[in-house]
Structure formats: C-alpha cells, structure tokens
Amino acid sequence: MKKSIGILSPGVALGTAGSAMSSKFFVMALAVFFSFAQVVIEANSWWSLGMNNPVQMSEVYIIGAQPLCSQLAGLSQGQKKLCHLYQDHMQYIGEGAKTGIKECQYQFRHRRWNCSTVDNTSVFGRVMQIGSRETAFTYAVSAAGVVNAMSRACREGELSTCGCSRAARPKDLPRDWLWGGCGDNIDYGYRFAKEFVDARERERIHAKGSYESARILMNLHNNEAGRRTVYNLADVACKCHGVSGSCSLKTCWLQLADFRKVGDALKEKYDSAAAMRLNSRGKLVQVNSRFNSPTTQDLVYIDPSPDYCVRNESTGSLGTQGRLCNKTSEGMDGCELMCCGRGYDQFKTVQTERCHCKFHWCCYVKCKKCTEIVDQFVCK
C-alpha cells in the first residue's frame, strides 16, 4: 500500500516571479521525489500480515467487511483484489508469513544478520532493498510459509474453495495399502501462494535491462524456489489398522514435511546461492558461466551482501553490537566472527531451568526449578 506524500504545499506557486526554483532545479527535485517515493513504496510488504496479524480478529469477518482489504498495509493492487475475492484466505496468508519470519530468525540466529524485524510494514527494513542472498532466502522462506499454511487450512476445512488433497496414488505404494485419508492439499496451496505472492512482482513494470527488472526476476525465481521446496518435500504418511495394532491394513495420504525441514533445505540453498546478472536479452544469467545454471529450486541473488558488522542506516544493517556470542565457538556464532574483531564484554546472569523431574502415576511429570549463575558474552 502506497504511503501518501505531499509534494508541494498549496501556498507554493510554480512559475511565479517570487519562486526561486528554476526549471532545472524543479526537474531535479522531481527526480529526487520519485526516487524517494519508489523507496517508500518498496518498503511495504505483504509480510507485514505476519506481524501481529490483524486478519485474525473476528470482527473483520462481519457482513460487508470489504474495507478490510484496503486497510491491510503492504498489499499491492493485485493482492487487494485477491483479498476481496478470498477474504477467508487472508488469515492463512498471515500465518504463512509469520511461519516464514520465525523460520528465517531460527536459521540465522547465529549469523551477523539474524533476520531482525523492524517496527513498520517493511518488516525487515531497508536491507531488503538490496538483492543479496539474505533477501533471496527471505523471499523463498516466506513464499514457502504461505504454501504450508494454505495447504493445511484446506485439509482442516477452514477454506470454502478447497478441501483434502486429491493427489494421485503414488505408483510405488504397496497394492494392499489404501490411498485415502485427508491429506494436505499442497496443489491448492502451491497455486494460491503463486497467485498471491507473485502478484506484486507481476504488476510492476520497469524498463528492460534495468536494475528493477532484474530484482523482479530475482524475486520471482526465489518465490518459486520456496514453493517448490515445500512441494517436493511433502511425503506419504500412513496409519495402521488392525486388531491389537497388527497393522494388517494401512491407510496413507500426502502430508507436508515439518517446516523446519523446509527451512533447513532453503538454508543449504542459501549457502550455495548463485550470483546472477542481466544479459542483453533481459534474462538473468550466472556471473560465473563455468558453474551449472541454477535450477528452479536454487536461490539466486544480484547484489553482494552489505557489511552486517556495523550499523548502517542506508543499507539497513543493524550491526552486531550487543549481540550474544559464544566464546568457545570457532563458527559464525563465535565471538571472534560475530563481533567482527571488535572484542566482547563479559557479564554474569542467573538462569532458571527445570530439573530433577519425576514421573508420577498417573500421569504427570513434576519438576523442581534450579538456578545457576552463568557467564555470557556480548559484542562491543
């Protein structure tokens, strides 16, 4: 959703003798304005539906609640149209965004950039304006989150336009096993996620060969990589039937993989993401042509990552000052790498944990609370 920006106050008249603005300066001012406006527009994202999700409030579903879609921050015009048509889907779009954000923060919890969110509709701040491999991962995991949420909502009967999976019986399923049950509707989840998530990119028009057109292609590719990862990791789940658990009969269905498995797979793709550039035909090609071309499940990026060591308002980097680090680790979570060589401070803190747990018949576990003083380290 675009933010309104006042260009000129009513009291300013162009072309009057009292105006000190020359035509040349005016053109320059407009150029700056539209550049700024572009940044503001790009700052909005549907990811904001995953932050304190407003569409979970019951009052938005009252009859005639059409204003809901126009009031949701971050939606493009195409996404607002889909919102009007499928209002019952919006809660699960928000859940998918939230799932993606949480998984991003888990996967990057020990990295200099830890998927921190900011308090506005951009969700991740200005860092997403850079076509880096971190941006690539974020687009992929959020698109994957929507497929995950929509597929499960169909299975649970929460949506009026879909139900249980209609996936064909796998050819390698044993003949005496039944194919049925109520599986996650991954086909529907994939299709709707593609329609909704890609809508913003497909309605943007930029000159062929421009940086903006490269970002659109990058975003679309990574959205698809996230969706396909969910689709390809889905597997057959089965339940036994029979007397005393003999499992003489099995009923099987299609089931989503645990989303942590999706996050792990996308994190591996992040580590091997392909650097891309636009060719003369306006297509993305690899910077290093000696490598194999990325598949539809690989992540791609067009910009080098910014310096995440220090706070930088222009790139959106929050820096690592104040981040906890592991003194004994030689990995990215270690104080040497996390603190970028600046050193670290040590302090003591009290931790409380459950301990001495015992099982009582029947049927509960009772624990005591134990406290200990531990050393912690934070980057200078």
From Swiss-Prot:
Subcellular localization is given as: Secreted, Extracellular space, Extracellular matrix; Secreted
**Positions glycosylated per UniProt:** 114, 120, 312, 326
* A GO-annotated cellular component: glutamatergic synapse
GO MF annotation: an example: protein domain specific binding
Q: What induces it?
A: In cartilage and cultured chondrocytes, induced by interleukin IL1B.
Propeptide segments, given as residue ranges: 36-61
Signal peptide per UniProt: 1-35
- Identify the InterPro entries for this entry: Wnt, Wnt_C, Wnt_CS
Q: Which residues carry the O-palmitoleoyl serine lipidation?
A: 244
What does UniProt say on post-translational modification here? Glycosylation is necessary for secretion but not for activity. Palmitoleoylation is required for efficient binding to frizzled receptors. Depalmitoleoylation leads to Wnt signaling pathway inhibition.
Question: One Pfam family, short name please?
Answer: wnt
Tell me how this protein assembles: Forms a soluble 1:1 complex with AFM; this prevents oligomerization and is required for prolonged biological activity. The complex with AFM may represent the physiological form in body fluids. Homooligomer; disulfide-linked, leading to inactivation (in vitro). Interacts with PORCN. Interacts with WLS. Interacts with glypican GCP3. Interacts with PKD1 (via extracellular domain). Interacts with TMEM67.
Q: What does this protein do?
A: Ligand for members of the frizzled family of seven transmembrane receptors. Can activate or inhibit canonical Wnt signaling, depending on receptor context. In the presence of FZD4, activates beta-catenin signaling. In the presence of ROR2, inhibits the canonical Wnt pathway by promoting beta-catenin degradation through a GSK3-independent pathway which involves down-regulation of beta-catenin-induced reporter gene expression. Suppression of the canonical pathway allows chondrogenesis to occur. Inhibits tumor formation. Stimulates cell migration.
Tell me what this protein is called: Protein Wnt-5a
Per the UniProt record, the source organism is Oryctolagus cuniculus (Rabbit)
Q: Which gene encodes it?
A: WNT5A
